[in-house]
A protein has these predicted regions:
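Flexible helix-coil transition and linker loops at the boundaries of alpha-helical arrays
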Residues: 18-29
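Domain-scale activation on soluble regions of proteins
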Residues: 19, 68-70, 257, 312
Length: 349
C-alpha cells in the first residue's frame, strides 16, 4: 500500500509541475495544477487515516496538511452561493470538474427530478441524511418534530438542507412538491405513489436538489449542462482541518471548519454557531461537517471506511417518511423503515 501511495503522490506531483494554474478559451476545463495538487492532497489524507495509519503516524498527517496548503495557496475562494456553485463552471471554488454543453449534455436532472415533473426520482434521500442537517441554533433535530402537530418539520434548519434536498411542500422547479397521500390511501399528490408516473416516485418521499438546474425545460432535447464537480475548495478546507486536528493544532482545525459554516449561514449571523469543541468532540464535528457540506459528492462511502466508523453508522435501520393529508388539509407525518443495512468489521474493511 505504501508503495502505491508513493507512486500516486509522485505522479500527481509531476503533473502539477507541468500543468498551468488555469486554462482559458477553448482549453478551459482541462486539468490544471490545482486539480493535480488537490488529488495529491486527497490521497495523502486517505493514507494518513486510521484505516491505513493504525499507529497514527503524525508525519503522515503533516504531509496531508502540507499538501492541502499547496492547493489553498493557488487563490481559490469559497463561492458565496452554496447552491449555485454547482451550476457555474466559473465558480471560484471549483478546482476540478467535468464540463458539459448543449451538444454533449447529461441526464442528471431527468434521473433525479420528481415524478410529478416527469423525472425518475433515482436518488431517494434517507431520513437519517435529512436529520443530519442541524437546527439553526446548532442542535440536532428532535424526532418529535415528525410526531407533533407541526406544519413544517423541516423549518429552521441549516440552509444547506434546502439547497441539497427537496422536502414535501417546498418549491421545486417552480411548483410546490406533493409527496403526500390522501387519508383514503388511494389517491395522493402529483409527486406521490399515486401521482404522475407512479412507478418513478421517491420511496423515501425525499429527493436530491443538489446539482439540479431548476431552469431546465421539460424537453428531451434539453439536456443538463451544469458541470460535475470532482473537487472544490470546501473539501480542501475540511481535509486541512482534519489533518491539523491530528497534528495537534485544534485552533487551526476549528478556524477552517468555521469558514465553511460561515458560508453556510448565507449572510446571517444568528444561525449555525461556530464550532468551539475540543478533543474527540471536535473530531466528531469535523466529520459531521464533512458529511453535510459534501453530501452526495461521493465522499461519505470512503470517509466512513477510512475513519473505521462504518460499523457504527452504516449498520443500522434506515427510514423514509410517510405524509398523510387529512380531510382538513393538515398533514400527519410518520417515519417508516425502508432498509436494514449491515456492516461486518473488520471483514468489510
Amino acid at each position: 500500500y505504501e508503495e502505491c501511495v508513493d507512486f500516486i503522490v509522485s505522479e500527481f506531483q509531476k503533473a502539477s509541475e507541468l500543468l498551468p494554474e488555469k486554462f482559458t478559451g477553448e482549453n478551459f476545463g482541462r486539468v490544471t495544477k490545482g486539480a493535480a495538487l488537490a488529488m495529491k492532497a486527497r490521497m495523502l489524507l486517505y493514507a494518513a487515516s486510521p484505516l491505513w495509519n493504525p499507529s497514527d503516524d503524525k508525519s503522515k498527517w503533516e504531509a496531508a496538511a502540507k499538501a492541502a496548503e499547496e492547493v489553498m495557496a493557488l487563490g481559490y475562494s469559497l463561492d458565496a452561493d452554496y447552491k449555485e456553485l454547482f451550476l457555474d463552471p466559473m465558480s471560484p471554488e471549483i478546482i476540478f470538474q467535468r464540463l458539459y454543453n448543449t451538444e454533449f449534455g447529461h441526464w442528471y436532472d431527468w434521473y433525479n427530478s420528481t415524478n410529478g415533473w416527469g423525472g425518475y426520482s433515482c436518488t431517494a434521500v434517507l431520513q437519517e441524511m435529512v436529520d443530519s442537517y442541524e437546527m439553526e441554533d446548532g442542535t440536532m433535530p428532535d424526532p418529535a418534530l415528525y410526531t407533533s402537530a407541526t406544519t413544517d418539520p423541516w423549518a429552521g434548519r441549516d440552509p444547506r438542507l434546502y439547497a441539497s434536498v427537496v422536502c414535501d411542500g417546498q418549491l421545486f422547479r417552480g411548483t410546490e412538491t406533493e409527496f403526500w397521500v390522501n387519508s383514503d390511501g388511494k389517491t395522493g399528490g402529483v409527486d406521490s405513489e399515486f401521482g404522475r408516473d407512479a412507478w418513478n416516485y421517491s420511496k423515501t418521499h425525499y429527493i436530491i436538489r443538489k446539482f439540479m438546474d431548476e431552469n431546465l425545460t421539460k424537453s428531451w432535447s434539453d439536456k443538463g449542462k451544469q458541470p460535475w464537480v470532482y473537487c472544490r475548495l470546501a473539501e480542501i478546507y475540511l481535509n486541512y482541518a482534519e489533518a491539523m486536528y491530528h497534528c495537534g493544532k485544534e485552533d487551526v482545525a476549528r478556524e477552517y471548519v468555521n469558514y465553511i459554516r460561515k458560508r453556510a449561514r448565507g449572510g446571517r449571523e444568528d444561525i449555525l454557531p461556530d464550532v468551539t469543541e475540543s478533543g474527540e468532540a471536535l473530531l466528531a464535528k469535523i466529520q459531521h461537517e464533512r458529511k453535510v457540506e459534501l453530501a452526495f459528492e461521493e465522499h461519505r462511502f470512503y470517509d466512513v471506511r477510512r475513519w473505521k466508523i462504518a460499523e457504527k453508522v452504516d449498520k443500522s435501520v434506515f427510514h423514509g417518511i410517510n405524509i398523510t393529508k387529512q380531510a382538513d388539509g393538515a398533514k400527519k407525518y410518520e417515519l417508516f423503515e425502508i432498509q436494514k443495512r449491515d456492516f461486518v468489521a473488520p471483514a468489510h474493511y
